[in-house]
UniProtKB/Swiss-Prot annotation:
Sites where the protein binds S-adenosyl-L-methionine: 79, 104, 131, 153
The species this protein was found in: Rhodopseudomonas palustris (strain BisA53)
Top-tier EC class: transferase
Protein family: Belongs to the class I-like SAM-binding methyltransferase superfamily. TrmB family.
Keywords of the record: Methyltransferase, S-adenosyl-L-methionine, Transferase, tRNA processing
Protein's recorded name: tRNA (guanine-N(7)-)-methyltransferase
EC number(s) stated in the UniProt entry for this protein: 2.1.1.33
Pathway: tRNA modification; N(7)-methylguanine-tRNA biosynthesis
GO molecular function: tRNA (guanine(46)-N7)-methyltransferase activity
Length: 250
């Protein structure tokens, strides 16, 4: 690999996007940032396209997050940890008047969604390669219509539970960023983490669990696009829980 190899630039671009977050010690909710070696075009997308779709948390947020997008966007939704981007891309294509922010620190996942954005000409996705906790703190109050957390890292060992994204502090942060009647959707095939999330959200005065019967959490949300991780869980005999919460009026 030569000094001019775009794969060097891709690492530098992602490092720039995440260094500020890491320096403040909030990088504990996610694990590795990079897996297999990027192909040349993937590296070019990280170096060239990602900066066009990213935003800088060092700058003050816009008063309205819709300003991050082209005119015509009427609401903004956030997906935390989008993995390969299957769900986020499907949502963006199905709802062109909604702006979507995708948060993913894993460089290979970022490369995958950038390739889809380029190939499909998607214009209503913005990307953030750092820590979602930092993003929630930066976002204006009541600026999001929905937050999705789909198949997050379950951190199954008890000593690692503090690294799970769902914590009392992040529940409070999500409540601040969501508008009244905004939604939080959680999908997980690990029963322990689903129970953990249900416990944290139902004890919060800011959220109400909307399920009225078992099928409300046993079946996917209407229009839901299964992710690669979801299909893998099904093949291995694990059934996901689909938890839907609504932000109570402040």
């Amino acid at each position: 690999m030569t000094p001019d190899d775009p794969r060097d630039a891709s690492d530098a671009s992602l490092a720039d996007a995440t260094a500020d977050s890491a320096s403040r010690g909030h990088g504990s909710f996610f694990g590795r940032r990079k897996g297999h070696k990027l192909r040349a075009h993937q590296a070019e997308l990280i170096a060239d396209l990602l900066p066009q779709l990213s935003f800088d948390l060092a700058a003050p947020p816009p008063a309205d997050l819709r300003a991050l997008f082209e005119p015509g966007v009427d609401q903004v939704k956030l997906e935390i940890g989008f993995g390969g981007g299957e769900h986020l891309v499907a949502e963006a294509e199905a709802h062109p008047a909604t702006g979507f922010i995708g948060c993913e620190p894993y460089v290979n996942g970022m490369a995958k969604i950038l390739a889809q954005i380029e190939a499909r000409g998607i214009r209503n996705i913005r990307l953030f390669a750092g820590d979602a906790a930092e993003l929630l703190a930066w976002a204006p109050k009541a600026s999001l219509a929905r937050i999705d957390l789909i198949h997050p890292d379950p951190w199954p060992k008890r000593r690692h539970w503090k690294r799970r994204f769902v914590q009392d502090a992040t529940v409070t942060a999500m409540a601040r960023a969501l508008r009244d009647d905004g939604e939080f959707r959680f999908v997980c095939d690990i029963d322990d983490y689903s129970a953990w999330t249900l416990s944290h959200l139902t004890r919060s005065p800011d959220f109400a669990w909307t399920a009225e019967r078992a099928r409300d959490w046993q079946n996917p949300f209407a229009g839901y696009t299964m992710t690669r991780y979801g299909r893998k869980a099904e093949r291995e005999g694990r059934r996901a829980a689909y938890l839907h919460f609504q932000r109570n009026a402040a």
